[in-house]
Curated annotation (Swiss-Prot):
Known function: Involved in the synthesis of autoinducer 2 (AI-2) which is secreted by bacteria and is used to communicate both the cell density and the metabolic potential of the environment. The regulation of gene expression in response to changes in cell density is called quorum sensing. Catalyzes the transformation of S-ribosylhomocysteine (RHC) to homocysteine (HC) and 4,5-dihydroxy-2,3-pentadione (DPD).
SUPFAM superfamilies recorded: LuxS/MPP-like metallohydrolase (SSF63411)
Key words, A-Z: Autoinducer synthesis, Iron, Lyase, Metal-binding, Quorum sensing
Species in which this protein is naturally found: Shigella boydii serotype 18 (strain CDC 3083-94 / BS512)
Name the UniProt record assigns to this protein: S-ribosylhomocysteine lyase
Signal peptide: none
Gene Ontology annotations of biological process type: quorum sensing
Cofactor: Fe cation
Entry-linked InterPro entries: LuxS_sf (IPR037005), Metalloenz_LuxS/M16 (IPR011249), S-ribosylhomocysteinase (IPR003815)
GO molecular function: iron ion binding; S-ribosylhomocysteine lyase activity
Reactions mediated catalytically: S-(5-deoxy-D-ribos-5-yl)-L-homocysteine = (S)-4,5-dihydroxypentane-2,3-dione + L-homocysteine
Binding site residues for Fe cation: H54, H58, C128
Cofactor mode of binding and number, as noted: Binds 1 Fe cation per subunit.
């Protein structure tokens, strides 16, 4: 099986919260697509609570679009990582990491402004697969933590696993 890009970086050296360009590619028509690793938690040391991360998933996608879309950038999707340490964001365009970090912080400020669980988008049986698994309080705790710790930039060059280590891991 081919090695996915996300498994070629050393998760033991990854900082959080931090932005990292996980992948760049071009469509057959030449449009640039960038995938960002938005790391909320230090891998293997922290994890987002499931209810809070689910609520954040509903809020984060819209708020990030409000702050990042435009000037050659359009978000395609923001999806939570299965390990619950962050989100992947796929978009058209090539914004630099600092622009993404600034939008992320602004989105976290927006999460803190949500006053009631009823303001969570698509929070109903028709539009959400587990509509009862939400916590606005946990989502706001996550947002507060991001803002208190600030958002850094993770460098692929600094996190790259050496080829010897990949071979040792039988990858």
């Amino acid at each position: 099986m081919p090695l996915l890009d996300s498994f070629t970086v050393d998760h033991t050296r990854m900082e959080a919260p931090a932005v990292r360009v996980a992948k760049t590619m071009n469509t057959p028509h030449g449009d640039a697509i960038t995938v960002f690793d938005l790391r909320f938690c230090v891998p293997n040391k922290e994890v987002m609570p499931e209810r809070g991360s689910h609520t954040l998933e509903h809020l984060f996608a819209g708020f990030m679009r409000n702050h990042l879309n435009g000037n050659g950038v359009e978000i395609i999707d923001i999806s939570p990582m299965g390990c619950r340490t962050g989100f992947y964001m796929s978009l058209i365009g090539t914004p630099d990491e600092q622009r993404v970090a600034d939008a992320w912080k602004a989105a976290m400020e927006d999460v803190l402004k949500v006053q009631d669980q009823n303001q969570i988008p698509e929070l109903n049986v028709y539009q959400c697969g587990t509509y009862q698994m939400h916590s606005l309080q946990e989502a706001q705790d996550i947002a507060r933590s991001i803002l208190e710790r600030d958002v850094r930039i993770n460098s692929n060059e600094e996190l790259a696993l050496p080829k010897e280590k990949l071979q040792e891991l039988h990858i």
